């Protein structure tokens, strides 16, 4: 098939690789423009653009797809289908209609649950035990289109947004290849009206740990915000990101370190096993404790 691929972050890269490996003809890759990054704040291409250039594919970086010039250029590609994975730009109706078979989106949730920008974070933070990927025929609404194919996976007790992100990316890559091979046989199923929830974008204000909350809530917050933006607390006057945890037994003052890095909460405790100190990389909590001088009885803020 002649495919237009639209994607930007790391999540999208395995999907592009899978389409190329399946010997589809990727006629163009659309990705958001390079952005300043790193200490030097030099423009850096998106992960998708970097991978596409390695593969020798044509890359386009429009700031918007609203102009008639951009829409005409896309239509002139005469694509059979567009595959859209975390692209980040709104697709006008003219773009949705341009490919012969329309635009297919890979969405990282079991629609209609968690429509929107942050479905992986929200699933973990809500305590969901199942999630998955949907291949959806795109329409004008936000993740409202009929679903062609669904693939499920369980959310484990130790899953973070990082681990689930990688797993769902791989599932999505296989699912879109399967969907394209069965496109004539698959029947798009409208999403039900019941069970709609929205995965709003994560706000950095959600990352500060409130030790008055119950342990299960704090544990889900830590796992759901790991690795980015990272739930955090103050320890010894410095910000400490909390990256991995589990619910534990124990009682004490709110935010009190009971032993190791097991911390008392509003109800129960959480055992934190991986952290990222301010200005440093991620490390095991036990290694951080060796130099942090955080003794039992210390209160995290």
UniProtKB/Swiss-Prot annotation:
Pfam families: Formyl_trans_C, Formyl_trans_N. Belongs to the Fmt family. SUPFAM superfamilies: FMT C-terminal domain-like, Formyltransferase. It is an enzyme of class 2 (transferase). It catalyses: L-methionyl-tRNA(fMet) + (6R)-10-formyltetrahydrofolate = N-formyl-L-methionyl-tRNA(fMet) + (6S)-5,6,7,8-tetrahydrofolate + H(+). The gene is fmt. Attaches a formyl group to the free amino group of methionyl-tRNA(fMet). The formyl group appears to play a dual role in the initiator identity of N-formylmethionyl-tRNA by promoting its recognition by IF2 and preventing the misappropriation of this tRNA by the elongation apparatus. This is Methionyl-tRNA formyltransferase. Keywords: Protein biosynthesis, Transferase. One of its GO terms (cellular component) is cytosol. (6S)-5,6,7,8-tetrahydrofolate binds at residues 109-112. The keyword Protein biosynthesis applies. GO terms for molecular function: methionyl-tRNA formyltransferase activity. InterPro entries: Fmt, Formyl_trans_C, Formyl_transf_N, Formyl_transf_N_sf, Formyl_transferase-like_C_sf, GART_AS, Met-tRNA-FMT_C, Met-tRNA-FMT_N. Its EC number is 2.1.2.9. The keyword Transit peptide does not apply.
């Amino acid at each position: 098939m002649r495919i237009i691929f639209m994607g930007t972050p790391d999540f999208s890269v395995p999907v592009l690789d899978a389409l190329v490996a399946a010997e589809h003809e990727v006629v163009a890759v659309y990705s958001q423009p390079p952005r300043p990054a790193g200490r030097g704040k030099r423009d850096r291409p998106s992960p998708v653009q970097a991978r596409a250039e390695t593969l020798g594919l044509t890359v386009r970086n429009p700031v918007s797809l609203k102009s008639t010039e951009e829409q005409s250029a896309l239509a002139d590609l005469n694509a059979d289908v567009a595959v859209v994975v975390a692209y980040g730009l709104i697709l006008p109706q003219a773009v949705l209609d341009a490919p012969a078979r329309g635009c297919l989106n890979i969405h990282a949730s079991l629609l209609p649950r968690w429509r929107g920008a942050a479905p992986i974070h929200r699933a973990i933070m809500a305590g969901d035990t199942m999630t998955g990927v949907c291949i959806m025929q795109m329409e004008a609404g936000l993740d409202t289109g009929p679903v062609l194919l669904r693939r499920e996976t369980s959310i484990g007790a130790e899953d973070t947004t990082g681990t689930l992100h990688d797993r769902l990316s791989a599932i999505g890559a296989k699912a879109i290849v399967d969907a394209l091979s069965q496109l004539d046989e698959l029947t798009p199923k409208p999403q039900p009206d019941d069970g709609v929830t929205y995965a709003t974008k994560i706000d950095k204000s959600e990352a500060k740990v409130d030790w008055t909350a119950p342990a299960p809530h704090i544990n889900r917050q830590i796992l759901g915000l790991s690795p980015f933006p990272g739930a955090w607390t103050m320890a010894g006057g410095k910000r400490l990101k909390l990256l991995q945890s589990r619910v534990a037994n124990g009682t004490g003052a709110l935010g009190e370190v009971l032993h190791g890095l097991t911390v008392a909460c509003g109800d129960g405790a959480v055992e934190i096993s991986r952290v990222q100190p301010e200005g440093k990389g991620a490390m095991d909590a036990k290694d951080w404790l060796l130099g942090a001088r955080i003794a039992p009885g210390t209160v995290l803020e």
